[in-house]
Amino acid sequence: ACYCRIPACLAGERRYGTCFYMGRVWAFCC
């Protein structure tokens, strides 16, 4: 599963880009 996170991905996840949600930029993590 993939998630949008602030401020960064959790350990063991990879960042594949960004999400724009509620006026903020989130890390897109899988």
From Swiss-Prot:
Pfam families: Defensin_1. The keyword Secreted applies. Disulfide bonds join C2-C30, C4-C19, C9-C29. GO terms for biological process: defense response to bacterium; defense response to fungus; killing of cells of another organism. Keywords: Antibiotic, Antimicrobial, Defensin, Disulfide bond, Fungicide, Secreted. It comes from the Eukaryota. InterPro entries: Alpha-defensin_C, Beta/alpha-defensin_C. It is found in: Secreted. Its main location: secreted. One of its GO terms (cellular component) is extracellular region. Belongs to the alpha-defensin family. Has bacteriostatic activity against L.monocytogenes, E.coli and S.aureus, microbicidial activity against L.monocytogenes and S.aureus and antifungal activity against C.neoformans. This is Neutrophil defensin 2. It comes from Macaca mulatta.
